[in-house]
Curated annotation (Swiss-Prot):
CDD domains: Transaldolase_FSA. The keyword Cytoplasm applies. Homodecamer. This is Fructose-6-phosphate aldolase. The keyword Lipoprotein does not apply. Belongs to the transaldolase family. Type 3A subfamily. One of its GO terms (biological process) is fructose metabolic process. Catalyzes the reversible formation of fructose 6-phosphate from dihydroxyacetone and D-glyceraldehyde 3-phosphate via an aldolization reaction. Keywords: Carbohydrate metabolism, Cytoplasm, Lyase, Schiff base.
Length: 220
């Protein structure tokens, strides 16, 4: 199972990489734009933050296949090993096929249906990213869509992985993992909610109080 952070905040990646078993970091144009640091400056810093074993994801901006391929090559040259995110449109599918031949790994992004995700995988995408909460927000069932996509990939494109994205709660992420997803990417707030249960602190404080009352110290 691969756990990613969905952010371009270098300081937060450095902080959480010490704590979480991270596989890397995913970004998108909106995330990069929010940080107001040019993509060619922030990507090397993020790569350093996740370490040599971490994987970095960044997205193209062109709308046509040839432009996507050219941008993907620039990204791959700037950050060796990067996985290039390609929106799963008609032109995006064409770009994924071309990049597969070039040996540049891709992630099919902006996936709102299982059929769309399957096409990306069949075209050669290494990862497929269904948007769980965004599907829910449109009146759909994001978890069910992920379940269907996971089953389809297992049957027809086992070399591709579902990398589920767009979460508002830890429960959504856990449901995707229970559906068999091999990878998820979490925004910072959801990642921290996974450890931020008030009951945990209450339990620790009770342990400390009992220990201190018995031994007059808070160490072994």
């Amino acid at each position: 199972m691969e756990l990613y952070l969905d952010t371009a905040n270098v300081a937060e990646v450095e902080r959480l990489a010490r704590i979480y078993p991270l596989a890397g970091v995913t970004t998108n144009p909106s995330i990069i734009a929010a940080g107001k640091v040019p993509v060619w400056d922030v990507l090397p810093r993020l790569q350093k933050a996740v370490g040599p074993e971490g994987t970095l994801f960044a997205q193209t901006m062109s709308r046509d296949a040839q432009g996507m391929v050219e941008e993907a090559k620039r990204l791959s040259n700037a950050v060796p090993g990067i996985v290039v995110k390609i929106p799963v449109t008609a032109e995006g599918l064409a770009a994924i096929k071309l990049l597969k031949k070039e040996g540049i790994p891709t992630l099919g992004t902006a996936v709102y249906s299982a059929s769309q995700g399957l096409l990306a995988a069949l075209a050669g995408a290494k990862y497929v990213a269904p948007y769980v909460n965004r599907v829910d927000a449109q009146g759909g069932d994001g978890i069910r869509m992920v379940q269907e996509l996971q089953s389809l990939l297992e049957m027809h494109a086992p070399e591709s992985k579902v990398l589920a994205a767009s979460f508002k709660t830890p429960r959504q992420a856990l449901d995707c993992l229970l559906a068999g997803c091999e990878a998820i990417t979490l925004p910072l707030d959801v990642a921290q909610q996974m450890l931020g249960t008030p009951a945990v602190e209450s339990a620790i404080e009770k342990f400390e109080q009992d220990w201190n009352n018995a031994f007059g110290a808070l160490n072994l």
